[in-house]
Structure formats: structure tokens, C-alpha cells
Amino acid sequence: MSHQPLSCLTEKGDSPSESTGNGPPHLAHPNLDTFTPEELLQQMKELLTENHQLKEAMKLNNQAMKGRFEELSAWTEKQKEERQFFETQSKEAKERLMALSHENEKLKEELGKLKGKSERSSEDPTDDSRLPRAEAEQEKDQLRTQVTRLQAEKADLLGIVSELQLKLNSSGSSEDSFVEIRMAEGEAEGSVKEIKHSPGPTRTVSIGTSRSAEGAKNYLEHEELTVSQLLLCLREGNQKVERLEIALKEAKERVSDFEKKASNRSEIETQTEGSTEKENEEEKGPETVGSEVEALNLQVTSLFKELQEAHTKLSEAELMKKRLQEKCQALERKNSATPSELNEKQELVYTNKKLELQVESMLSEIKMEQAKTEDEKSKLAMLQLTHNKLLQEHNHALKTIEELTRKESEKVDRAVLKELSEKLELAEKALASKQLQMDEMKQTIAKQEEDLETMTVLRAQMEVYCSDFHAERAAREKIHEEKEQLALQLAVLLKENDAFEDGGRQSLMEMQSRHGARTSDPDQQAYLVQRGTEDRDWQQQRNIPIHSCPKCGEVLPDIDTLQIHVMDCII
């Protein structure tokens, strides 16, 4: 057992029991005794600044993540709204195209009927004048109604086609066609003069990028121009329809006048009496009636031409309808054949969810930091309140001192001065006692720190002693095992020695018995007797017990009890 002094721990820097409390075991704590207070303050300030910088970096990162998340959410909402808008537009376009197809079929049938009637009227105009009055009036009424209906349907068709073109332009399809509709000033019914299709480049909708402000402004200006042009066209068409209605009214009035004149003529023909003046008027009457009928025929032919123009415009509208149907089919194909876009959207939704979770975690961390900052703010507010109170008390004390000085200067009552002096003495005594208590506390703290240091040293030394004890115990166990082995070997050797001695004695006895007469000298007998006594003493020494204490000589039965006794005896 090796007794090491307390100074051995300071000399041995690599004790096996030393280990750091925090951090990895290969990093040791810095020795605070080597640093000065100023260096410690500087390190604390540096740590505080680094902490502040890290907080600011976390805040900036949180703000950036929020901005990205808001941008992604806005982009996804825009994508959803645009998709819904495109779907609704495609449905409306399909419905309107179906309605337009039905209306076109009806108009074709009506135009065929009108063509047949106009051809009949152009082939035999003399027969039309001979028709009965009732049939002529019915045909005129039918023509008027058909003309008004055709005009209204033309205006509706033009408006629907323009709306469809505008909606297709605004839907952002793959073939972004720009349609310009201009109305001719000299036409009677506001027919479409030019429909220009300018094929634009295909758009590639890039993820994460929004439309620029200039493009939006140009698009809005173009929409406003097209709407204003359509409104002007509709106004002109309405005005022309009103003019045609007025012209039809005038023609109707003329027809009624001619009917009256014809009735008067029939009455004049039935009468037997007539004058030459009346005959001249009668001759002039049919001529005027024929001229007016020719004018009506011209109006009918002009209306037929207008109907032909409407037919051509309807054919153009059918072509536009086919193009629109093709575009709708292309849009449907795009909407149906976009699995990759759906996968991308799913990935975006997954990333959005991840970002939402990250933002929620960051928000929770921010809330924790805000709660900590609020606690610190409350503590600071409490400290400020206490500081303000202390300042107020200090100011009050200063004021009282000033008042006392004034009273002393003015030689106020000595009793008050005595009381104040006594109070001051008591306060000084209290301060001195408190200072003494503080000094005592500092001394006790220093002693406790020293005791703690000594305790740590003692603990380390105890661990060293324990390790030495265990090492010595293991060595003793090994020595005990070796002793047992040696004892066994001794026993074997002693047995062999006894056997050899017995054999020697027997051989001696035999020799003595053989040579008894020769060796009768007394000296030789005495030598043999002495040798026998020495052999007995050596056997007695050999029979000494092995388990005995080396210090006090106490004999013990076992090696374990011997070790315990040796530890107690030595310590």
C-alpha cells in the first residue's frame, strides 16, 4: 500500500479519474485561474454579441422563409384560379358553340327560303303586281319580320364571336391568337370587314414567375380597345336597323297610298261618267304605281344582297367556330394529357407542406423567443421600477440632507441635529456591521471554495489510493497464489526429502548393522546423535504455520482474513 501525499495530484496531470463534466472527454475545461477578470468580461461581451448576431440571422432567415412561403401560396392560389377560369371558359365556349351551330342551321334554312322567294320575285315581277293585296301584305310583313330577326341575330352573332375571341385571347392558350374586328363605315348593317388572325408565339408558363406589369397594362388596353370597338359597331348596327325600319314604314305608307289610289281607280272605272282630266290622272296613276313597285323590287334586291352578305359572314363565323372548336379540343387535350404537371403539382404541394411545417416550427421557436424576450422585458421593467424607486429615495435623501444642511446653517434646533447625528451613527454602525458580515461571508465563501478545492483533491487522491489498493490487492492475490504453489512444491519436496532421509537412515542402519564391530568409536556415535537432533529441529521449524501477520505475528486460518487483518493492522 503506497501512501501518496496531497501534492502528488498537482504533479500528476493525467490522473485516470479526471474527466470533464460537459462536452467530449478529450476536451478539458479551460483553467479559469489563468484568465484575468478583464479578459473574462471581454469573452462574455463577445459571446453576447455572437448570440445577438445569431438571433438576428435567425430572424432574417425566418422572414425569408415566410416570404418564400407566402410567394408559393400565392402562386398555388393563382394556379388554381387560372385552372378553374380556363375550365369554366372551355365549358362556356362549348355551350356557345353548340348554340351557334343550332342557330346557324336555322339561319341557313331561313336563308334558303328567302333565296327561293327572292328568285321567284326577281323572275316575274309583273306577276307579283297582279297578286292579291292580302298575299302581298303578308309577304311584306314576313319580309319585315325576317329582316329584323336577321339583323338581331347578326348583331348577337357578332357579339358572341367577339366575346369568344376575347376570352380565348385572355385564357392564355398555347396558340395565343390576337383578333381585330373593324366595322366598315359605308355598309348598311354593320358587317364584319376584316378578321385578322395574327399567330403569336407559344407561351411557356414558367413555375414561380408572374406576369410583368407592362404585359398586364398592354393586355388591359387591348381589351378596352376591342370592347370599345364592339360597342361602336353595335351602336352603328342599331342605328342602321332603325333607318331600315323607318324606310320600311315609309314603303308601307306608300303601299297603303297606292292601295287607296287603286281603290279610287276601281271606283272611277265603275262609274260611267268621267272627264278627260280624270283619264289623264288614271293614266298617270298606273305609271306611278309601277315606278313604286320597281322601287320596292330594288329594295327587295338590296335586302337580298344584304342577306347574301350575311350568309358570307355566317360562313366566316362557321370557320371561326371551327377554329374555336379546334382550340377547345387542344385545350382539352392539354388538360387531359398533363400527368407530369400533376406530379409536379403534387411535389409542390408536398414541398409546401414541408415548408408549412418548417414555418410552424420556426413560429413556435419565435413564440418561445418572444416569450423569453417578454419575460426579460418584464424583468427589465421591474428593475427599472426598482431603480426609479431607489433614485427617488436617493433624491429624497439628498433633499433631506440639503434641508438638514440648511437647518444647520440656519442653526435649527440642536435636538433635531442630535437625533440626526444619532441616526447617522446608527446607520454607520449598521453599515459597519453589514460590512463586517459581508467580509465574514466573503471569508466563509473563500474557505468553502478552498474546502471544495481540497475536497476535489482529496477525492482524486482517494481514487488514486483506491486504484493503488486494488492493484496491491491483485498483486497480493498473485503472491498468495504463488505462495500456495510454492507450499505445494515444498510439501512435495519435503515428502521426497523424508523419503530420501528414511532411505538414508535405513542405509545407515544397514551399514551400522553390517559394520557394527568396526565403528564402535564413541565420537562417531555422538555425531550421529547430534545429527538426529538437528533433523528434529528443522522439522519443527518446517511445521510453522504459513498464515501469520508479518507485523504483529498473529496466526490466521485463511488468506482472506489475513488480508483484512493486514489492512486494519497497517492502517
Curated annotation (Swiss-Prot):
One of its GO terms (cellular component) is cytoplasm. Phosphorylated by TBK1, leading to restrict bacterial proliferation in case of infection. Residues 38-170, 233-502 form a coiled coil. It comes from the Eukaryota. This is Optineurin. Pfam families: CC2-LZ, NEMO, zf_C2H2_10. GO terms for biological process: autophagy; cellular response to unfolded protein; Golgi ribbon formation; protein localization to Golgi apparatus; regulation of canonical NF-kappaB signal transduction. Gene3D superfamilies: L1 transposable element, trimerization domain, Nemo cc2-lz domain - 1d5 darpin complex. It comes from Macaca mulatta. Residues 1-32, 100-144, 186-210, 255-291 are annotated as: Disordered. Present in aqueous humor of the eye (at protein level). The modification Phosphoserine is found at S177, S198, S336, S520. A zinc finger (CCHC NOA-type) spans 541-571. Residues 100-143, 186-197, 255-268, 275-286 have a biased composition (Basic and acidic residues). Transmembrane segments: none annotated. Zn(2+) binds at C549, C552, H565, C569. Its main location: cytoplasm. A motif (LIR) lies at residues 176-181. Plays an important role in the maintenance of the Golgi complex, in membrane trafficking, in exocytosis, through its interaction with myosin VI and Rab8. Links myosin VI to the Golgi complex and plays an important role in Golgi ribbon formation. Negatively regulates the induction of IFNB in response to RNA virus infection. Plays a neuroprotective role in the eye and optic nerve. Probably part of the TNF-alpha signaling pathway that can shift the equilibrium toward induction of cell death. PANTHER family: NF-KAPPA-B ESSENTIAL MODULATOR, OPTINEURIN. A motif (UBAN) lies at residues 468-473. Residues 201-210 have a biased composition (Polar residues). Residues 58-209 are annotated as: Interaction with Rab8.
